[in-house]
Amino acid sequence: MTPETDALKVQILPKHQSLPYTVTKAKSKSLILLVVVSVTITLGLLLYVFNSNSVISSGSLLSRRCKLRYSVLIDAGSSGTRVHVFGYWFESGKPVFDFGEKHYANLKLTPGLSSYADNPEGASVSVTKLVEFAKQRIPKRMFRRSDIRLMATAGMRLLEVPVQEQILEVTRRVLRSSGFMFRDEWANVISGSDEGIYSWITANYALGSLGTDPLETTGIVELGGASAQVTFVSSEHVPPEYSRTIAYGNISYTIYSHSFLDYGKDAALKKLLEKLQNSANSTVDGVVEDPCTPKGYIYDTNSKNYSSGFLADESKLKGSLQAAGNFSKCRSATFALLKEGKENCLYEHCSIGSTFTPDLQGSFLATASFYYTAKFFELEEKGWLSELIPAGKRYCGEEWSKLILEYPTTDEEYLRGYCFSAAYTISMLHDSLGIALDDESITYASKAGEKHIPLDWALGAFILDVVTPNSDYNGKSRKYLGF
């Protein structure tokens, strides 16, 4: 509180004013002394008030620094492993998050942990490097009070459980010796629906809609490497196996969330190429056209350099496939992939395979590979789906040699896949999920909100963990932070 003081008032007589009596020399000195003392006291009080405000301000900053807490989360994805280092604090009993550079840092290393299926011990190298990165951003005195977790996603979900556990045990060994607070159960493979929920939390936290009317929230459609997630609040009845309920503040949200495993960009492309290769075996010359790869591409040229485990064995396709980029044919081929198994649908709505999907409603953010594809083609954020079709047609129909020259700074691994990505995006969002091409309620994004918070599911996992450290979510006990 700022001290309240009344300024001292000192009356000084005008220099030429006639006095009714004679002022003695002693009295004159006393008056001068009084003035000096009064001015000194006034300046002293003003200085005290100024310093008090400075101390209060500095004290608040120091208090926040003293209360700063840290959390480390390692996202073990299909194409790479990324560490997130979070700094946060509490004010009035509520957590305060700051995802700016001062209190948040991340680093990604390739390849993903799933690529170590044949050599689990190899996973320790990248995890150790990520732990060292985290240590450089957290004060040493806070190590024992800072938790570290590892959450693996679709790439690991595709592996057999025994192989998953072998890789996880290697990572646990590294995390146990990290110096951070860790428990073995904090390194695990999360479900696809959980991943979708975390992404939804990140987006709605960034947009400021957490804690508001559920139907005013924003949905997420996310295209990863091994899986695709669809997550939103639906007014329809959702079967319990497809719904999750979370609480934020005083509001409960019942959310449709599903992860379409094997329908991520890399996994779907691999599946398509394998289907084409199998069909080539039944042709006279043993060769079939691949409509999703630009003409002139040689399949075994760059496969050894691919960071994605899904395309690392591309050289096996040489001789059976001929690149013949054609957007319309690629769109048809990818749509056929998405319809497989639909005849087994037991629900009213099955947009992809035999999986229940309610009609999409409200606004949506298209993230991950949806974003990268739209960004590559420099599409407008509104109505971008309608622009993607002509852009995809031009790109797919171009010669590979010309594309390399046109995009010299783009990694050939990604350049080779944009024809497929463009067609697959239209097949999934428009042909399967029913989003109109001119629908402006869906935008592509990698960040959201006034603070441009990254749309990364790991941030949502961190937020939910801090907000509800002791609650039970999806049948799994949340960890206790230890403070």
UniProtKB/Swiss-Prot annotation:
The chain crosses the membrane at residues 30-50. One of its GO terms (molecular function) is apyrase activity. It is a single-pass type II membrane protein. Keywords: ATP-binding, Calcium, Glycoprotein, Hydrolase, Membrane, Nucleotide-binding, Signal-anchor, Transmembrane, Transmembrane helix. It comes from the Eukaryota. It is an enzyme of class 3 (hydrolase). Its cofactor is Ca(2+). The keyword ATP-binding applies. One of its GO terms (cellular component) is membrane. It is found in: Membrane. Disruption phenotype: No visible phenotype. It holds the Pfam family GDA1_CD39. Glycans are attached at N250, N281, N305, N326. Belongs to the GDA1/CD39 NTPase family. This is Probable apyrase 3. It comes from Arabidopsis thaliana.
